[in-house]
């Protein structure tokens, strides 16, 4: 018994097993008919699970769905998290229906982001718990407190650093390639040794390769294979033999080459061996020695280690000279082929307008050629009959054989008052000594006058040939019809006088039509609303007309429609037209009863096929007179068919008139009206046949008992009440609208009333205004479309759009107000008033977005809740602790009820969730050298700001290679005016070229540096969707005990449905269900994805941008150019000579700030591959066939297990490629992809130098100079100097310094005093730096920065030092040349310190001494002996003489 009690106690003390995790807090419950499946998920801060607990009541079985959360990072609320798109904290939120979805958060706690350039570490600092993420080439994330460091190890890092609410993207590069360092860091070597090895890797590789080659040659020397090297050594041995025999002094004892430090040998150079030196000397002196044996020496060299060592060094140097380092190689990129997109939508609109454009062009073409032909004809006529044309202005006088101007001409018999005076201005003297003869020049001025007049008329015709004047005639008949009390036949649509008809009227909106009619005094201003309300389509306009129950209103609207479609009834003059389509189709689709029996009758053939219409009027009496006798039903049907066709042909007032005649049984008036229509449109055969048929039917006896269709009663006008029934009132108006006003800038309204007025023209009810204020002096305003809202602060006040009274009531115009005062108006209760309800406001909500917005004229902090409503909230960071994650208080402590703001009031929002701002590196250009010195000496190594000296900011990191170029321009006695230089520069970022500008005589004038600061092509991409791996599945399911599965399973947007029948069986059914092989399990599901990849689509075409800079010693300037537009300024003329075209992919993916390209699904495309599950605007979409199973429980509902919902092929995204040359710039919803490693073409540059008077330059110039320098040694920025030079003359001065100066020669002028120099110093200077300008030494003050940064920050689109270094130095030997010798000598420098000079002198002295002893002395002795021989020979010759 005791054992049993112990067991019971132990069992009671044991915890109840729970799946996924123990404990946890319930965050949401949702009783529902549908159950959720058990899901257990983990996010960055917690674990969450859902489960279903079934309960039964009187109405059935229900599921109490529960969500439970357990915190893993308990203090994450201390960082004050807030929701933001693209945040780096993934949190699973629970919806109201217990569906799970992933949201992203960031911390609101402040965080300082910096980069320690000396240790290459990202430094993050905060005061509380915070979360960081580094994405890009390095990916790291985590929680931290206080300060943390993240080490960078990629050669070039392209990063997006996010910490707290801040995000910064930047580009950073080391001063050396880091692949070697990363490799050695994985070994046992300490970090300092690894860095030293990698810094000296070039010399290490050279020595290692040399040793390997030497070992190989040493091994080969032991075999006969070594003789393969004889072709190499034979030429060397042969040359050495020549030098040996002819240039070296011989030893007196043995006859071999002089050897002061060794004994005489036993072997001769020819290979002979002698025991004594005397025999050797005899052999050499007697001429028996054949000389130096080159072949023997070559064989010895093949076996010797000395030549092998020298050969190994030479081979290693040659190999490394032509081998590119792996780190500086640019791998080839695969180019993706894209198919052409479909034509844009606007092409369809263009295609629809081609016909009208074609007709316009044809007309224009015809008129133009007509004018040309007329001009040619007039020209021919003028040439043939020009005397008749010219006779208009001048006459020929036969008496004096001259031409006289007709203006002011008077006749005196056969003579005139202008005789002896010709039109050419020449006179004939009285003596007759100067005889005048008429010539061509006499009438030239009149021909020119004719030509001028003709051209003026011709040009005037050309200018007005395309002009058109739209004139709308005044509606006199319409005005008359408005004055009639009832409808008349001549006041129906077909008979209205519309005046001139212009086709352009069809394009006018009804607003303009109303303005035209109001201007013609045809309508009142109170009629404008009913006209502007006409639908734009004809069918809608006709329905709108027939909905009006008053003749004057209907007539007004129909007149407006016919003013727009002024050819509507003129189309009836013929047998076709857009306005006849409806009634003709109606006739074709309906059959007359008589035509079924007599299909060959002329009338029936006319109606059906359009045949025999001309004879259809006479075959009624002859062939159909007996058909309708005693057949009233058929009579009624056929006549109603004809009348209905007439109704479809003539809608509006015509149909109303016909309905009136039918209701009055005025058959004669009806026939008279149809005959007037037939008379107006005699050319319409089918219309004429129908009207004749109606007239014929009227003559038959069945007309007395004819019953027309009921729809005609709907077309009858209703009695015109004094006030509309829906606006009726029980008493006279208490409002005095004669005193009404309409004030502006009113946002509140008291005693709101609806107002109705009668139009004095059409009698239409004008109900477009409301009244506010007191009855004695009401204020009237335009009626709001959305009603009015009761104010949340004062319940007697009403507002527009929402309860905050932010919108002004729209005042009516003065013309409208005057019409209201003159019209009959009354007030009624305004029905569209929205009173404040208790459920309209809220204290907290699940936040969708937050930020600061312009609300009307104010700047408010606003929260957008998950229900898409906007609320004022001054906190945006205060959690509602009574709710789950994501619920924020709208007021401090959730104490105040807040009401929604209308979205119309909200504009210019800085959303913090949907549009996060990403900062970039700040570049500060400092003009003053002292300010620059102060900025860089304050040790701002962790700042993300770059400081540039303005005058040298456009210089490259490395001194460029100079080339000589001749100055061009206009040569003068002083020099060259308008001087310029022309050159070509490759459009590649980081390219720099130095120009040594020479005069035409070859004199060096000055140095200029051209630098391509940036060269890239880019496109802007917009986000389509997010995707990622499936982390769980949302499921809702239900079951039926009996019966089939539902045909349509209810599900949410984006969810897939599943079902399985015959699920009920013994032991697998809920309590109370007794079924076997029956029932159904069904439900819906949706994947829960972890958003890891964002997909973007290209929105803009590629934009090529190149920034080219020119830097002189006293100025610098840049220009941005593109391949399309050349740049022409006072300083630059730049254009692309050749252009290379590239394209960026249409769809890209971004993961961890890294671009990926490849096969990616577009939005709405769910094919197999990357991106077939898409999250768009918070909803997840996809395709697939869900796979599910279920577990049976006795007398309980089944446990559904969904194993797969969507087809998610996210693993295919892992095979996407990451192009090395692409860079990414993120910016609030869009990204810009930049490719900066392509040569975009060749730039042709013309630099304008102005006037260079180099011939007046002085050779000797007095300069007063001072300077200031600052910078660092062996760093990225180097040394920057500012020289202040004062001189009275112009001169070209060379620049000399112990450091490498970028500009070797500058131009000094009296007008310019500030000059800037950039230089690279390998030795640390003292407190001053000596710079020689011309012959003047300048002791410039030097301020050095002690920091030695190993990493360089740069903007995204600019090149770094390491890339310029790789472009300049592409081989291993280049690296050895630049760094290797210095590295070898560095240990000795550290050892001897300041005595290094003495050490170097000692070493050089020893080397020189050895060269003198072993090289120079033998040569000198040989020369001395040769000279002595010549002296001895001379003496012997003198003795003989």
UniProtKB/Swiss-Prot annotation:
InterPro entries: Bunya_G1, Bunya_G2, Bunya_nonstruc_pro_NSm, M_poly_OrthobunV. Keywords: Glycoprotein, Host endoplasmic reticulum, Host Golgi apparatus, Host membrane, Host-virus interaction, Membrane, Signal, Transmembrane, Transmembrane helix, Viral attachment to host cell, Virion, Virus entry into host cell. The chain crosses the membrane at residues 201-221, 306-326, 362-382, 451-471, 1396-1416. Residues 1066-1087 are annotated as: Fusion peptide. GO terms for biological process: symbiont entry into host cell; symbiont-mediated perturbation of host process; virion attachment to host cell. Glycans are attached at residues 57, 490, 1177. It holds the Pfam family Bunya_G2. Residues 1-13 form the signal peptide. Residues 14-200, 327-361, 472-1395 are lumenal. One of its GO terms (cellular component) is host cell endoplasmic reticulum membrane. Residues 222-305, 383-450, 1417-1433 are cytoplasmic. The keyword Membrane applies. Glycoprotein C and Glycoprotein N interact with each other. Belongs to the orthobunyaviruses M polyprotein family. Glycoprotein C and glycoprotein N interact with each other and are present at the surface of the virion. They are able to attach the virion to a cell receptor and to promote fusion of membranes after endocytosis of the virion. This is Envelopment polyprotein. The lineage of its organism: Viruses, Riboviria, Orthornavirae, Negarnaviricota, Polyploviricotina. The gene is GP.
């Amino acid at each position: 018994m005791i054992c049993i009690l112990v067991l019971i106690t132990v069992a009671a003390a044991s915890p109840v097993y729970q799946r996924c995790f123990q404990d946890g807090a319930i965050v949401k419950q949702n009783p529902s008919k549908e159950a959720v499946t058990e899901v257990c998920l983990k996010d960055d801060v917690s674990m969450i699970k859902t489960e279903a607990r079934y309960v039964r009541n009187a109405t059935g079985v229900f599921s109490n769905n529960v969500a439970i959360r357990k915190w893993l990072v308990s203090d994450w609320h201390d960082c004050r998290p807030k929701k933001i798109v693209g945040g780096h904290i993934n949190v699973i939120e629970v919806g109201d229906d217990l569906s799970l979805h992933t949201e992203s958060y960031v911390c609101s706690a402040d965080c300082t982001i910096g980069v320690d350039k000396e240790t290459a570490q990202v430094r993050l600092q905060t005061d509380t718990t915070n979360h960081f993420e580094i994405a890009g080439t390095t990916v790291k994330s985590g929680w931290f407190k206080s300060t943390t460091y993240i080490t960078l190890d990629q050669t070039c890092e392209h990063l997006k650093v996010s910490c707290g609410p801040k995000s910064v993207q930047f580009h950073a590069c080391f001063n050396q390639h880091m692949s070697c360092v990363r490799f050695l860091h994985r070994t046992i070597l300490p970090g300092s040794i690894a860095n030293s090895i990698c810094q000296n890797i070039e010399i290490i590789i050279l020595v290692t390769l040399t040793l390997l080659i030497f070992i190989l040659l040493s091994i080969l020397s032991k075999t006969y294979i070594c003789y393969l090297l004889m072709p190499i050594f034979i030429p060397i041995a042969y040359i050495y033999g020549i030098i040996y025999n002819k240039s070296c002094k011989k030893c007196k004892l043995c006859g071999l080459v002089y050897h002061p430090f060794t004994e005489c040998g036993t072997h001769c150079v020819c290979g002979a061996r002698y025991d004594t030196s005397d025999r050797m000397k005899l052999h050499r002196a007697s001429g028996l020695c054949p000389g130096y044996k080159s072949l023997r020496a070559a064989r010895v060299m093949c076996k010797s280690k000395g030549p092998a060592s020298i050969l190994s060094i030479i081979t290693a140097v040659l190999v490394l000279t032509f081998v590119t380092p792996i780190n500086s190689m640019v791998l080839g990129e695969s180019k993706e082929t894209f198919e052409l997109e479909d034509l844009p939508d606007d092409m369809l609109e263009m295609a629809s307008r081609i016909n009208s454009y074609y007709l316009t062009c044809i007309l224009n073409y015809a008129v133009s050629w007509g004018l040309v032909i007329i001009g040619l004809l007039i020209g021919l006529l003028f040439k043939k009959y020009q005397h008749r044309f010219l006779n208009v202005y001048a006459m020929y006088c036969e008496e004096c054989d001259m031409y006289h101007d007709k203006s002011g001409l008077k006749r005196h018999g056969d003579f005139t008052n202008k005789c002896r005076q010709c039109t050419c201005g020449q006179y004939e003297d009285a003596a007759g000594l100067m005889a005048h003869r008429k010539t061509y020049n006499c009438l030239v001025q009149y021909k020119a006058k004719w030509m001028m007049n003709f051209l003026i008329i011709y040009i005037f015709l050309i200018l007005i040939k395309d002009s058109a004047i739209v004139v709308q005639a005044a509606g006199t008949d319409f005005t008359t019809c408005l004055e009639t009390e009832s409808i008349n036949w001549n006041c129906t649509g077909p008979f209205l006088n519309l005046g001139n008809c212009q086709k352009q009227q069809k394009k006018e909106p009804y607003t303009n039509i109303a303005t035209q009619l109001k201007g013609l005094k045809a309508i009142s201003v109170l009629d404008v609303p009913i006209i502007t309300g006409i639908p734009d389509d004809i069918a809608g306009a006709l329905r709108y007309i027939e909905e009006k129950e008053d003749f004057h209103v209907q007539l007004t609207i129909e007149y407006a429609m016919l003013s727009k479609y002024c050819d509507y009834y003129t189309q009836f003059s013929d047998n076709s037209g857009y306005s006849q389509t409806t009634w003709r189709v109606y006739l074709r689709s309906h059959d007359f009863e008589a035509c079924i029996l007599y299909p060959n009758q002329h009338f029936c053939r006319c109606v059906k096929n359009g045949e025999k219409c001309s004879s259809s009027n006479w075959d009624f009496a002859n062939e159909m007179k007996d058909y309708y006798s005693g057949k009233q039903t058929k009579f009624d049907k056929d006549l109603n068919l004809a009348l209905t066709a007439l109704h479809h042909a003539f809608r509006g007032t015509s149909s109303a008139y016909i309905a009136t005649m039918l209701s009055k049984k005025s058959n004669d008036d009806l026939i008279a009206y149809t005959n007037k229509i037939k008379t107006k449109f005699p050319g319409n055969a089918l219309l004429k046949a129908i009207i004749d048929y109606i007239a014929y039917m009227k003559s038959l006896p069945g007309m007395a008992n004819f019953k027309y269709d009921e729809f005609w009663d709907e077309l009858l006008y209703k009695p015109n009440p004094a006030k509309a029934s829906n606006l009726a009132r029980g008493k006279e108006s208490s409002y005095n609208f004669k005193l009404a006003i309409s004030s502006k800038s009113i946002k509140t309204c008291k005693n709101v009333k609806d107002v109705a007025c009668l139009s004095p023209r059409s009698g239409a009810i004008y109900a477009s205004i409301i009244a506010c204020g007191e009855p004695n002096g009401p204020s009237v305003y335009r009626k709001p479309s959305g009603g009015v809202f009761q104010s949340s602060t004062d319940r007697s006040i009403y507002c527009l759009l929402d309860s905050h009274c932010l919108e002004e009531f729209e005042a009516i115009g003065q013309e409208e107000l005057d019409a209201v005062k003159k019209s009959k108006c009354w007030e009624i209760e305004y029905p569209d008033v929205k009173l404040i309800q208790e459920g309209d406001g809220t204290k907290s909500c699940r936040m969708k977005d937050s930020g600061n917005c312009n609300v009307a004229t104010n700047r408010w902090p606003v929260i957008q809740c998950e229900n898409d409503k906007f609320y004022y909230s001054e906190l945006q960071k205060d959690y509602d602790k009574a709710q789950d994650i994501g619920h924020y208080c709208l007021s401090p402590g959730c104490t105040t009820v807040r009401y929604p703001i209308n979205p119309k009031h909200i504009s210019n929002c800085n959303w913090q969730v949907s549009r996060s701002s990403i900062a970039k590196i700040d570049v500060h250009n400092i003009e003053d050298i002292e300010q620059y010195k102060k900025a860089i000496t304050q040790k701002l190594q962790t700042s993300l700001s770059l400081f540039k000296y303005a005058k040298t900011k456009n210089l490259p990191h490395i001194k460029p290679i100079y080339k000589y170029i001749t100055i061009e321009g206009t040569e003068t006695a002083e020099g060259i005016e308008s001087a310029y230089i022309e050159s070509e520069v490759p459009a590649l970022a980081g390219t720099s070229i130095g120009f040594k500008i020479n005069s035409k005589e070859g004199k060096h004038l000055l140095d200029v540096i051209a630098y391509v600061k940036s060269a890239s092509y880019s496109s802007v991409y917009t986000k389509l969707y997010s995707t990622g791996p499936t982390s769980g599945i949302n499921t809702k399911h239900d079951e039926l005990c009996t019966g089939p599965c539902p045909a349509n399973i209810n599900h949410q947007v984006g969810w897939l449905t599943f079902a399985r029948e015959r699920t009920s069986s013994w032991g697998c059914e809920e309590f109370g269900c007794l079924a076997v092989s029956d029932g159904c399990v069904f439900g819906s599901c949706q994947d829960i994805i972890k958003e890891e990849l964002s997909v973007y689509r290209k929105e803009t075409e590629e934009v090529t941008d190149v920034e080219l800079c020119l830097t002189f010693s006293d100025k610098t300037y840049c220009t941005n150019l593109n391949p399309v537009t050349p740049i022409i300024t006072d300083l630059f003329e730049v254009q692309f000579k050749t252009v290379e075209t590239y394209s960026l992919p249409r769809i890209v993916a971004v993961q961890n700030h890294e671009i990926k390209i490849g096969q990616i699904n577009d939005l709405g495309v769910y094919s197999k591959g990357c991106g077939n599950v898409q999250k768009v605007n918070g909803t997840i979409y996809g395709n697939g066939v869900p796979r599910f199973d279920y577990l049976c429980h006795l007398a309980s509902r089944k446990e559904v297990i969904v194993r797969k919902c969507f087809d998610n092929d996210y693993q295919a995204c892992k095979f996407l490629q990451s192009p090395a040359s692409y860079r990414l710039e993120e910016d609030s919803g869009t990204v810009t992809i930049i490719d900066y490693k392509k040569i975009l073409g060749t730039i042709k540059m013309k630099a304008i130098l102005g006037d260079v008077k180099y011939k007046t330059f002085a050779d000797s110039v007095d300069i007063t100079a001072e300077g200031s320098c600052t910078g660092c040694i062996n760093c990225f920025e180097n040394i920057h100097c500012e020289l202040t030079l004062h001189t009275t003359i112009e001169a070209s001065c060379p620049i000399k310094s112990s450091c490498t100066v970028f500009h070797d020669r500058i131009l000094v002028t009296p007008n310019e005093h500030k000059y800037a120099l950039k230089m690279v110093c390998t030795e640390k200077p003292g407190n001053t730096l000596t710079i020689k300008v011309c012959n003047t030494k300048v002791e410039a003050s030097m301020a050095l920065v002690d920091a030695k940064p190993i990493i360089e920050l740069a903007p995204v689109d600019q090149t770094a030092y390491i890339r310029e270094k790789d472009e300049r130095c592409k081989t291993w030997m280049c690296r050895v040349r630049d760094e290797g010798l210095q590295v070898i000598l560095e240990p000795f420098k550290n050892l001897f310190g300041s005595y290094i000079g003495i050490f170097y002198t000692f070493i050089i002295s020893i080397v020189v001494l050895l060269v003198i002893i072993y090289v120079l002395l033998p040569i000198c002795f040989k020369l001395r002996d040769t000279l002595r021989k010549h002296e001895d020979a001379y003496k012997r010759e003198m003795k003989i003489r």
